[in-house]
Amino acid sequence: MAKYFGTDGIRGEVANSTITAEFTQKLGNAVGSLINQKNYPKFVIVGQDTRSSGGFLKFALVSGLNAAGIDVLDLGVVPTPVVAFMTVKHRAAAGFVITASHNKFTDNGIKLFSSNGFKLDDALEEEVEDMIDGDFIYQPQFKFGSYKILANAIDEYIESIHSRFAKFVNYKGKVVVDCAHGAASHNFEALLDKFGIDYVSIASNPDGLNINVGCGATCISNIKKAVKEQKADLGISLDGDADRIIIVDENGQEIDGDGILNILAQYSDICGGTNGIVGTQMTNMSYENHYRANKIPFIRSKVGDRYVLEDLVKYGYKIGGESSGHVINLNFGTTGDGLFTAIQLLAIFSQADKPVSEFKLQGELMQQTLINVPLAKKVTREDLQKVASDVNDVEKRLGNRGRVLLRPSGTEPVLRVMVEADDKSLATNEAEYLVEKVKQKLV
């Protein structure tokens, strides 16, 4: 089991967990030393979101890298996918993002990309963890690394998207965008301006403490309200580092990551094409049935965009994502990208010329009840075995009417209990039954 890395990098409460200046400096030094060992280019890229803790953590990271002889190019406040994009474009050995994504401002973390723009695999994460716990290494003969700032890094990313989609995007509707007071603030607006979109921006005034507070992709009541007030045709909500996207239609109704994938699958020719879709264990069964009926190959990965990416590569598909709004298109990028996904959707909506609500899957979706159960420590396989018989009982009662998923969070001590069924009360009752069993046996 990983000591520091979760499903999406390293994350925790600032100063009260792993996320300290001391640890972050060791992380930078460990990765820098590993770069030297493997003879990779002695050059990395860093970026951050809008959290107040981002500055001191970034410079701690940079000091560890510089001590190991690694040059650092700082992009400033940019969305996570921009760091992945620039890492590949500028042929850096790695890319770092100081972010805790959709978490509250008191948390922070580090996402780490390899030279190909992919998140590290488990084996490489283990190597990094071993080196973190080793000696701090200084580059001999004073061959320390340099530190430079790249102003307007977002421009290269925007131009790349614009060159691909300018001929498709001619959207005439009114759009509301929620930037979660995060890394998309001003950056997303610059992208929309490039395409001539008529938009109203909310939650785009970061102060270091308001990231994700009552806004963003994990609090869509904000965008729903704004769409109705503005009489808009579309709402787009991103999270703190802009690797997630959730949209709402002209009626203020949510279309989550599953729904977005379904839209991309229907119009994949505009998005570069794909011969299959990768969802996750959380993907609603209604979409799986829909793909099967339309002869679109569909695979479920483990939850986490890194696992979606692994299966995209394994099966040779191009488009995949999660219910939570991580959407990957390997025709363009290598990680969840809320901004690029938004432009793909605007291209589709421009070409199809019908209300956003008409792009939704027709008919009732299977009903999902998801309950997060806080625990004292991270959940182990042994813990799950303690409630295996209870899960089996629920599965027997559901029969072919639904399914059960118990999933430990990869970033915090939480067990996610999900029951899906063709009836909401059935899903809720069975989920609550399992939550009680979890509390009895694991809390």
UniProtKB/Swiss-Prot annotation:
One cellular component (GO) term of this entry: cytosol
PTM: Activated by phosphorylation.
Keyword NAD annotated: no
Cofactor mode of binding and number, as noted: Binds 1 Mg(2+) ion per subunit.
Catalyzed reaction equations: alpha-D-glucosamine 1-phosphate = D-glucosamine 6-phosphate
Cofactor: Mg(2+)
One protein family per Pfam: PGM_PMM_IV
Protein name stated in the entry: Phosphoglucosamine mutase
Binding positions (Mg(2+)): 101, 239, 241, 243
Naturally occurring in which organism (per UniProt): Francisella tularensis subsp. novicida (strain U112)
Molecular function per GO: magnesium ion binding; phosphoglucosamine mutase activity; phosphomannomutase activity
Keyword entries, A-Z: Isomerase, Magnesium, Metal-binding, Phosphoprotein
In-chain residues carrying the UniProt-annotated modification Phosphoserine: 101
Similarity annotation: Belongs to the phosphohexose mutase family.
Active site: residue positions: 101 (phosphoserine intermediate)
NCBIfam families attached to this UniProt entry: glmM, PRK10887.1
Record has Transmembrane helix as a keyword: no
InterPro entries: A-D-PHexomutase_a/b/a-I (IPR005844), A-D-PHexomutase_a/b/a-I/II/III (IPR016055), A-D-PHexomutase_a/b/a-II (IPR005845), A-D-PHexomutase_a/b/a-III (IPR005846), A-D-PHexomutase_C (IPR005843), A-D-PHexomutase_C_sf (IPR036900), Alpha-D-phosphohexomutase_SF (IPR005841), GlmM_bact (IPR006352)
Superkingdom: Bacteria
Function, in words: Catalyzes the conversion of glucosamine-6-phosphate to glucosamine-1-phosphate.
Gene: glmM
Record-linked SUPFAM superfamilies: Phosphoglucomutase, C-terminal domain, Phosphoglucomutase, first 3 domains
Biological process annotations from GO: carbohydrate metabolic process; peptidoglycan biosynthetic process; UDP-N-acetylglucosamine biosynthetic process
EC number: 5.4.2.10
